[in-house]
Amino acid sequence: MYKYILFDLDGTLTDSAPGIMACIRYACEKMGIECPGDSVLRAFVGPPLMDMMKKTFSLTDPEAEKMLAFYRERFSTIGLFENSVYPGVGEMLSAVKSSGKKLALATSKPEVYAVKILENFSLSGYFDAVTGSELSGAHVEKRDVMALSMQKLSAKKEETLMVGDRKFDLEAANELGVDALFVSYGYAEKGEEIPYRPKF
């Protein structure tokens, strides 16, 4: 019986791809880099952005930091709100909360942005804890934010369920010994979840 439910944000509760992709395009323009097509940009939804920028554009750490600063320049004021809640999410969170579960948000997105997004969509009240990365780059790995969320809730791993849409969520759940529920409507590539064998 699960008492603690951890939720990913992007691709699980909200469709944030439009804002993220627009901000990557903006950062590419600022950096003078040719921007790839949408199929490549969609891969930026979910994983830590610095890692994706270095890998996709062959950037050094300082170059990736500069690109991330340009990304945040637009995201913090515009991109964050180019986002929508998936149908039924509010009702689902309400039902889970009403059943007596403790809920936490566990996202690699900076916590300061995650809080604003939840507030913007009136979802804050469902969560007992919100955990994201720091703007400094700390706690950017999914395992770290999940572990911190569990710490905030005083959650035992055998009583915890992670809900997410990407391999990063499932891999982190496996590493922490937590069951996972994979949502298929998010940003995962076809079959991405199979090697991680989520419980649901």
How should each PLM-predicted stretch be described?
Residues 69, 124-139:
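A short, structured active-site edge motif that brings together acidic residues
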Residues 90-98, 150, 170-174:
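Surface-exposed amphipathic alpha-helices with a cationic face
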